[in-house]
Structures are given as C-alpha cells and as structure tokens.
C-alpha cells in the first residue's frame, strides 16, 4: 500500500481430497488477514478421484495411458490411494452423484475457495463437472465427516512461530 502497489488477491494451489496441506494449513492466516481467495486446480487429482482407475487397470482413453503420464500414474495409483477412492464410492452412490462431482463439490464447499479449475477431454465431462455445483448443498457436516473418515487427510494446523 505504501508503494501504491496492488497486492495479490488470489492464490492458485492444487487442492483435492489428497492434497490439502497448503489450503487448510499453510494459507489459513492469509484468508482473513489479507482477504486472499483461492482458485484451485486438480479437484479430482488428475482423474484418480473419478474412480475409473484400479491397480493394473488403466483405461486406454485416459491420460494415464499416455506415455508422458506414466510417472504420474505410478505415483498416483498406489494401494492406499485406491483403497480410499473405493471407500468414497458408497458415499457418492448414497448421494446419487458421480465420484468426479463429489470431488469437485468437496473443493467448492471450502469457504476460502473462490473457484475450482476443472479439466475435461469430452463435452460430457464438462456437463458432469458443472453439475458438481448442485452437489455442494448435499455436503452436510455428517457427509463431510464420512468423507474424512475414509480419506483421513485433514492436515494439522501449523503453529505460529511468533
């Protein structure tokens, strides 16, 4: 302000059920202190949260089938992650929503998230992703507790160093 500069108003971190630390721990002091919002990306963890992947089964039309995504697939499709994804399927089913919609809605339900960047390779995925906004009201505290019980990824809040 003293230099007549405009400060940042948004941060763009990765945010999904498996990548939460920055958004829910490191950046917490920024939201109210500086009024910073978040434009997050990778809400379905490169497609992992769609539930279409399983150990040794990568659909031919998926990004993980491409040579330049092999390393990401190897890092992402580990037993613990796939177990958690499978544990989320009954929750999505109970709500009558797709796994992608559940993942996107979960991100959008965070009050510090201003927008969620999604990706799609098909028109049908865009339509499905947009319907995630209708899912946000279904994410009651009880549903969020069920989700957390499966993924167990809530970060611990950083202690102040002052």
Predicted regions and their residues:
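Beta/alpha (TIM)-barrel catalytic core signal, keyed to glycine-rich beta->alpha loops juxtaposed to Asp/Glu
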Residues: 1-151
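Amphipathic, coiled-coil-like alpha-helical segments
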Residues: 153-157
């Amino acid at each position: 302000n003293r230099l007549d500069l405009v400060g940042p108003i948004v941060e763009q971190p990765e945010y999904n059920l498996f990548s939460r630390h920055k958004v829910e721990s490191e950046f917490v002091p920024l939201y109210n202190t500086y009024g910073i919002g978040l434009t997050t990306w990778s809400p379905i963890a490169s497609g992992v949260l769609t539930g279409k992947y399983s150990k040794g089964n990568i659909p031919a039309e998926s990004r993980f089938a491409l040579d330049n995504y092999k390393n990401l697939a190897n890092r992402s499709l580990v037993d613990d992650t796939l177990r958690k994804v499978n544990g989320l399927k009954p929750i999505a089913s109970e709500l009558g929503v797709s796994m992608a919609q559940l993942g996107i809605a979960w991100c959008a339900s965070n009050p510090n998230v201003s927008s969620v960047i999604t990706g799609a390779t098909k028109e049908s995925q865009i339509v499905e992703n947009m319907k995630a906004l209708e899912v946000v009201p279904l994410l009651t505290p009880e549903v969020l507790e069920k989700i957390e019980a499966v993924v167990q990824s809530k970060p611990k809040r950083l202690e102040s160093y002052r």
